[in-house]
């Protein structure tokens, strides 16, 4: 799941500044501020998840966080249309950052908690590899989708972000299924 949430986050975050620049005429500096907002709410989400100490609450963090990230990512889609203000993407990215902030560290804690101490290094490596692979695969896939949909003008951004939403929806579904059996 960490590869999914991280890959979808990074991929969307790569395309949002380009969308704001191309569709809404924002300067690169203005468009780049969206990455700051996502980082700030990621930190807030991480802080919040660190305050959850009940086992039941900790088990829910990945599904709640993934759901929030999905909603926030979907909220950025309307900003791909010139008639909708680019600020919509900023608001959506605030929400998405909160979601990944809840999920990402909770998955690390969960992974290490179910691993014997002598295998923590392996688990940590596997989580890092999932992050890297998720990011690399989704960015590459999104680049292919964007190139294929480029003739659709601003709708090419919709294609990419919607694809990341589908991936997050899959992650949400898988996480909810795992929670039923763990």
Task: Walk through the language-model features, giving the residues of each.
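12-transmembrane solute porter fold
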Residues: 1-181
């Amino acid at each position: 799941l960490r590869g999914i949430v991280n890959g979808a986050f990074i991929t969307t975050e790569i395309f949002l500044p380009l969308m704001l620049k191309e569709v809404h005429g924002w300067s690169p500096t203005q468009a780049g501020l969206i990455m700051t907002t996502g980082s700030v709410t990621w930190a807030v989400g991480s802080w919040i998840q660190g305050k959850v100490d009940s086992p039941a609450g900790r088990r829910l963090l990945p599904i709640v966080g993934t759901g929030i990230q999905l909603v926030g990512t979907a909220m950025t889609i309307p900003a791909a249309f010139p008639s909708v203000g680019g600020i919509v993407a900023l608001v959506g990215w605030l929400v998405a950052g909160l979601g990944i902030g809840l999920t990402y560290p909770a998955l690390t804690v969960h992974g290490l908690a179910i691993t014997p101490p002598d295998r923590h290094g392996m688990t940590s490596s596997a989580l890092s590899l999932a992050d890297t692979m998720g990011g690399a695969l989704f960015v590459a896939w999104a680049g292919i989708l964007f190139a294929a949909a480029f003739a659709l003008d601003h709708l090419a951004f919709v294609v990419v972000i919607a694809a990341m939403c589908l991936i997050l929806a899959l992650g949400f579904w898988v996480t909810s299924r795992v929670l039923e059996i763990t």
